[in-house]
């Protein structure tokens, strides 16, 4: 069994991570640490886990007791944690924050998008788990980027559920504002753009990214279009070839809906050609393929396990 610890255990991503790990056949959770919830029962915060576990949030931890550490703290806190703790030489770390995703700040962390870096991830000790928007958009465009077929402006509209804003309610995330409502935020400036442009190796000024707050809890529905000389048959073949060995990214010949991926680690892509424009739909669960599910996928890879272990999940399709 692989002994794991979690830092920052009170949020949505940590709650989903705990849910996945307690059902993972190769995992023993040693501690879940949370400053704000220390000594409370985990099921009192993550109420969906009632009957599944009896652990409490710890107020202390020993990194020498674990093999893998998941960092689920706020952006900025992971870097501070690494700087202020002695990390034993065998400890593997998977960070779910933004702190080590960019190349200039990586500090030995490998960018953990398996569809891009799977073989590098297998050999890595430290993983920077990608952002949710970044995951959806990169998976929509990677096959084109790797064939050097991105040659014009890219237009992206992506709508996300309220859980993407975190567990603490804000003026734009609590129910009475979010329900029956929709709004644009961080147009052209979203922090995930840098991840996207670095991985795709494409000029940042050619991305037109409009993130949208949706009136639902979870999931990302991204639409992407760009000019392309490919006909639809060739485009679908390029995508099918690229994702042929992917454990979780699939091409659908039918226009997908968000419920097909909610509660799963899947990304479903759909392609259409309209005149000279290639149109791509990319859908994921922001808390799973966009966060905790992808973290477990990376955990499996760095631990030499089957990539899909613990991630056979049923979609909320009905």
UniProtKB/Swiss-Prot annotation:
Pathway: Amino-acid biosynthesis; L-arginine biosynthesis; N(2)-acetyl-L-ornithine from L-glutamate: step 3/4
Pfam families per the UniProt record, alphabetical: Semialdhyde_dh (PF01118), Semialdhyde_dhC_1 (PF22698)
One Gene Ontology cellular component annotation held by this UniProt entry: cytoplasm
Keywords: Amino-acid biosynthesis, Arginine biosynthesis, Cytoplasm, NADP, Oxidoreductase
The keyword Cytoplasm is annotated on this UniProt entry: yes
Intracellular or extracellular location(s): Cytoplasm
Reaction it catalyzes: N-acetyl-L-glutamate 5-semialdehyde + phosphate + NADP(+) = N-acetyl-L-glutamyl 5-phosphate + NADPH + H(+)
E.C. number: 1.2.1.38
Keyword Transferase attached: no
CDD domains, sorted: AGPR_1_C, AGPR_1_N
Main location group: cytoplasm
Gene Ontology MF annotations: N-acetyl-gamma-glutamyl-phosphate reductase activity; NAD binding; NADP+ binding
InterPro entries listed in its UniProt record: AGPR_AS (IPR023013), AGPR_type-1 (IPR000706), NAD(P)-bd_dom_sf (IPR036291), NAGSA_dehydrogenase (IPR050085), Semialdehyde_DH_NAD-bd (IPR000534)
Active-site residues per Swiss-Prot or TrEMBL entry: 132
One example of a Gene Ontology biological process annotation: L-arginine biosynthetic process
Biological function: Catalyzes the NADPH-dependent reduction of N-acetyl-5-glutamyl phosphate to yield N-acetyl-L-glutamate 5-semialdehyde.
HAMAP family: ArgC_type1 (MF_00150)
Family affiliation: Belongs to the NAGSA dehydrogenase family. Type 1 subfamily.
Protein name from the UniProt record: N-acetyl-gamma-glutamyl-phosphate reductase
Organism, as annotated: Azobacteroides pseudotrichonymphae genomovar. CFP2
């Amino acid at each position: 069994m692989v002994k794991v610890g979690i830092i920052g255990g009170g949020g949505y991503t940590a709650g989903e991570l705990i849910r996945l790990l307690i059902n993972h056949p190769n995992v023993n959770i040693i501690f879940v640490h949370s400053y704000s919830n220390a000594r409370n029962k985990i099921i009192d915060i993550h109420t969906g886990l009632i009957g599944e576990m009896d652990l409490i949030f710890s107020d202390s931890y020993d990194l020498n007791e674990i093999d893998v550490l998941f960092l689920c703290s706020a952006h900025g806190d992971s870097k501070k944690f690494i700087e202020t703790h002695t990390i034993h030489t065998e400890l593997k770390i998977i960070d779910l924050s933004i702190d080590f995703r960019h190349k200039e700040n990586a500090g030995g962390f490998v960018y953990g998008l398996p569809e891009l870096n799977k073989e590098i991830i297998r050999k890595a000790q430290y993983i920077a788990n990608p952002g949710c928007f970044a995951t959806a958009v990169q998976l929509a465009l990677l096959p084109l980027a790797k064939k050097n077929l991105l040659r014009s402006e890219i237009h992206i509209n992506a709508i996300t559920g309220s859980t993407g804003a975190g567990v603490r309610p804000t003026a734009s995330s609590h129910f009475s504002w979010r329900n029956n409502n929709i709004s644009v935020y961080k147009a052209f400036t979203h922090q995930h753009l840098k991840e996207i442009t670095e991985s795709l190796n494409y000029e940042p000024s050619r991305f037109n990214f409009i993130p949208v707050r949706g009136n639902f809890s979870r999931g990302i529905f991204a639409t992407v279009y760009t000019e392309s000389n490919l006909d639809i048959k060739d485009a679908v073949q390029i995508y099918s070839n690229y994702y042929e060995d992917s454990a979780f990214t699939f091409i659908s010949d039918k226009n997908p809906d968000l419920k097909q991926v909610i509660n799963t680690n899947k990304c479903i892509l759909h392609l259409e050609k309209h005149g000279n424009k290639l149109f791509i739909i990319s859908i994921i669960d922001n808390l799973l393929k966009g966060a905790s599910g992808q973290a477990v996928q990376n955990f499996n890879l760095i631990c030499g396990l089957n990539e899909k272990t613990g991630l056979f999940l049923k979609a909320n399709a009905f």
